[in-house]
Amino acid sequence: MAGTAHQHGRQPQAGGRERSPATVWESAALIALALILCTPFLYLLRSSHSVHPEPVSENRFIGSEACGACHQPSFDQWQNSHHDLAMDIASEATVLGDFNDIAYTDPHNQVTSRFFRQGDKFMVETEGPDGTLQTFEITHTFGVYPLQQYLIPFPGGRLQCLNIAWNSRDNRWYRVPPYDVKGTDDWLHWTKGGQTWNGMCAECHSTDLAKNYDMDTDTYQTTWFEIDVGCEACHGPGSNHAEWAKKPAMARSRIDNAGLVVDTSDISSSRFISICAPCHSRRYQLGDNRHQAEDVLDTMVPSLLEEGLYYPDGQILEEVYVYGSYAQSKMFRHDVRCSDCHDVHSLKLHKEGNDLCLQCHRAAEYDRYEHHFHQRQFEGKPSDGHLCVKCHMPARTYMGADHRPDHSIRVPRPDLSESLATPNSCSTAGCHADKALSWVTDHYNRWYGASKKPHYGDLIAAARAADPDAAEGLRTLAGDALSPVIVRATALSLLRNYPGPATTDAMIAALEDDDSLIRHTAIRGLQNLDLQTRLTHIAPKLYDRVKGVRIEAAAALASVPKTSLKDDDVEAFEAALREYQAAMRYNADFAPQRYNLGNLAAAQGDNDKAIGYYQQAIKIDDQFYPAKVNLAMLFNRTGNNEAAANLLREVIAGNPQLHEAVYSLGLLLAEMGKLEEAAELLGRAADSMPEYTRPRYNQALALLKLKRYEEGEQALLKALEVEPANREYFSTLANLYLSFNLIDRARTLVETTLEKVPDHAEALQLRDLIRQNRTPP
């Protein structure tokens, strides 16, 4: 209110009486004296604040209790919040589950577990890593509501998350998904890597967590400063701030942000959201959180709108948390931040029901029947159909008990449900799930009109289905600055399936985008291009200010000889490559990161090291098929074709939908001379991927070598039907006809081709030869 006080000071005195000259001179003298007396203090104040700031010592963590000594209201709000109760030592005060010798039979695998006490200890008898019933001590609780999970110590410094949890809403034991665990060797079994607390959960449930995974010994020495999510998990280490705050106000030197590492005041919405994003997102971490990131991609790389994680229109499907969905929302683009709805300390909503939304949206326009068309009372009972969140934030249930609203905050689109088989809030359980989709659409169109805006979901769905017509739309969407960044990056990523000059140009343009996620995705799209393209366009990104972009550039340039790099670029490349390797080693308790290290070794020509990394990835997760496919390719390259074929057969047996693996095995068997099986597999691959013509062409070649000429002819015709301009396919079929003197068929081939591709050089040449009654020798 300083401005208001200043304005009041300029108002006339009461009664409007003017002051005498003597009074004015007396006032002036007093002011002058005050200035003289204050000058030394002003100088000292100025000096301490701006000329010679005191050196700042290394920041250390001090704990939430220390913060609460000064910030009592915030501390009180934080206590008993989900952050405060994120993890704890198992005790009478913290354990919610019933351990009074309670038996629970898992309906999915018929294993009966028993929960009981052994003195002060909390025990469970359940299926162990070898499939037999074993007894384990529970040492830690994990979470509190709507479920509480339990952690069990295992060798190698591991804590394993039991797959049976306590439903604290319904007060019962229940099995936590996933349910399709294929035995005790499955990575998803509760005793294996998919349920290891150290790598899967720990970083977001404790403060100053250091994972400390040693990939050489496959062990952890995980530590934390505070077991739960305390003040410093968001604000960063607080020792410098505490020292600063202890001093009298006049003695406090000017240090940035009062000594706090993370600035949470007077920052942009995107910067604010980036504080929450590292935990509230589907992503992979680049290292322990040191609270010094300027950009989200300095600490993690968020998942895009990938198939299996999101529906094609961007609605949540798998457990993706909040960031990826919220980043699509209009709220995100209009600078609405998490704290506008959630209290940052208690995590509770500021208001209940529609009042939360009416903080910004006009009640007269939105909180009325003419907008939502739902009554507050229906058939004599309260109805929640009028609530904003029921339509705009439909929830999905995760972990078998946790109902999480979709934070993309979207307008319902039942029309997309018809075309894309995506969910819509009208048809969800508890609303109109019993009604036909046509009934929902009819009502929606009657209320809001049938005219619909174009939606990126149509394009993403088409690209996922490898629609050849999707490429142009993807390029447009990737370059559309008005679309959400995560949507643009997804379009750019999907463009990798449409190689060609136009796609390359789009990727190169995206390298200069302001957003790091776009730049990161563009590098991935260029990493398999020729040496000169990568040197020209990717090498400058070795200097990018964002870590996630730099290390992706280093990985993309790994196969480039250092002699091809400029002298200055060699040092930048080596520095970024070290960052990349450190990030992969940090996450090497997961198969994908060992796989990435294998790819790096292979790119650098170290086949033995690459084979070792691929085998380690497979040992971690036997169902991680990319490592098996790449290992098979490496075996093939080093002459071990039998081992390569066996690996690919293993992949296909467990993943029959992996048509690329079927194609690879077909090619390998053709190379090995096993043409009958090769032709069958190549045909399967071609049938499964009709948009890709190469499998069909290779099937044709195998059939021709087997002297199954008519089948080979049909395969070539199918390939040309999809890609009529392909000269290689045309020439192979033309030579087949000419070798058997099938001139009429050759003439028909020429005519059909020229109808579709009038300037087809080979077809024009063959037409002239046929007209002259000549054929090539």
Please state what every model-predicted region is.
Residues 65, 73-143, 149-155, 161-163, ...:
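Primarily the internal scaffold of c-type cytochrome electron-transfer domains
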Residues 468-478, 500-512, 530-542, 564-581:
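Amphipathic alpha-helical scaffolding segments comprising HEAT/armadillo-like alpha-solenoid repeats
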Residues 485, 516-519, 547, 591-592, ...:
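Helix-start (N-cap) detector for alpha-helical repeat units in TPR-like alpha-solenoids
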Residues 498, 513, 529, 544-545, ...:
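Structural marker of alpha-solenoid helical repeat scaffolds
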Residues 501-502, 533-535, 569-581, 604-616, ...:
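Structural signature of tandem alpha-helical TPR/SEL1-like repeats
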